[in-house]
């Protein structure tokens, strides 16, 4: 027998899953969703390259979910400061402490679209320019 609270949690989870499936179908299914995620990732990598920021993983091995980048080659760079700058402007990135290298990560899935990749790039450009 489930408790009332556990039952409510279960119902919310089922409803959330049903909504996620509905949104996936509305977007055109898995193929269309993957296309958007892949496009987000392509744009992100291109925009970061313009800033001189290189991906940690070679493109042949890179998936469209999250991308790890090396820190910019700027002696004034501070990840915590950049993180806060980006967060204050409505976006989030992640520390890249899954490697021994100095890296950070950016996700490209979920409610994220190509225009978000361009906006994030613009925010990062402004931040890095302020450090010159």
Give residue spans per PLM region.
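Single conserved hydrophobic/aromatic residue that forms the stacking wall/gate
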Residues: 1-6, 10
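Short glycine/serine- and small hydrophobic-enriched flexible loop segments
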Residues: 18-23, 125, 129
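Conserved PLP-dependent catalytic core of the aminotransferase class-I/II
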Residues: 21-56, 84
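Conserved PLP-binding catalytic core of the aspartate aminotransferase-like
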Residues: 54-85
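Short amphipathic alpha-helices in soluble, non-transmembrane regions
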Residues: 79-87, 120-125
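Conserved PLP cofactor-binding pocket of PLP-dependent enzymes
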Residues: 89-105
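PLP-dependent enzyme catalytic core of the Aspartate aminotransferase-like
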Residues: 102-132
């Amino acid at each position: 027998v489930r408790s009332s609270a556990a039952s409510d949690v279960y119902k919310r989870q089922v409803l959330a899953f049903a909504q996620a499936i509905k949104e996936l179908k509305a977007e055109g299914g898995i193929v269309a969703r993957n296309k958007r995620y892949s496009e987000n990732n392509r744009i992100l990598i291109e925009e970061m390259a313009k800033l001189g920021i290189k991906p940690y993983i070679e493109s042949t091995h890179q998936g469209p979910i999250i991308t790890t980048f090396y820190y910019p080659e700027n002696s004034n760079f501070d990840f915590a400061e950049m993180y806060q700058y980006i967060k204050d402007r409505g976006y989030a990135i992640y520390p890249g402490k899954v490697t021994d290298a100095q890296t950070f990560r950016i996700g490209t899935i979920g409610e994220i679209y190509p225009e978000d990749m361009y906006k994030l790039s613009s925010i990062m450009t402004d931040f890095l320019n302020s450090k010159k």
